[in-house]
């Protein structure tokens, strides 16, 4: 049986996500993947420059000292920190840790994740700069 009735199709604009702050923040958080791709490509080029000798490495370091590249890398760092913050806030929701018959709140888990991140960063910087 066929019908001539047209089904209702709710109109949806391409800017639907701009209406609520939750969706805007979600799109910003998902957009942190773009700077991550930039950093990955930059890291791969750095590895190839390191492999190709001192002249290639010096050229790569000169590239990194370009003010535009420094600004892009600072934006990438900010995006990585935002992504890390949101990921650390999500982790306690996935973990069900019970101590003495009581579920642990999200604060200790988030603080411990940040502590591990800070310690790992300090160790990596120490090894890179002083080893």
Swiss-Prot record:
Alphabetical list of InterPro entries matching this protein: Fumarate_red_C, SQR/QFR_C/D
Protein topology in the membrane: Multi-pass membrane protein
Entry's Gene Ontology cellular component terms: fumarate reductase complex; plasma membrane
A family per Pfam: Fumarate_red_C
Transmembrane domains' residue ranges: 30-50, 63-83, 109-129
Keyword S-adenosyl-L-methionine carried by entry: no
Keywords of the record: Cell inner membrane, Cell membrane, Membrane, Transmembrane, Transmembrane helix
Gene3D superfamilies associated with the record: Fumarate reductase/succinate dehydrogenase, transmembrane subunit
Chief location category: membrane
Keyword Membrane appears in the UniProt entry: yes
GO molecular function: succinate dehydrogenase activity
Location(s), subcellular: Cell inner membrane
HAMAP family assigned: Fumarate_red_C
Subunit note: Part of an enzyme complex containing four subunits: a flavoprotein (FrdA), an iron-sulfur protein (FrdB), and two hydrophobic anchor proteins (FrdC and FrdD).
Function, in words: Two distinct, membrane-bound, FAD-containing enzymes are responsible for the catalysis of fumarate and succinate interconversion; fumarate reductase is used in anaerobic growth, and succinate dehydrogenase is used in aerobic growth. Anchors the catalytic components of the fumarate reductase complex to the cell inner membrane, binds quinones.
Recorded family membership: Belongs to the FrdC family.
Name used for this protein in its record: Fumarate reductase subunit C
Species whose genome carries this gene: Shigella dysenteriae serotype 1 (strain Sd197)
Gene (name only): frdC
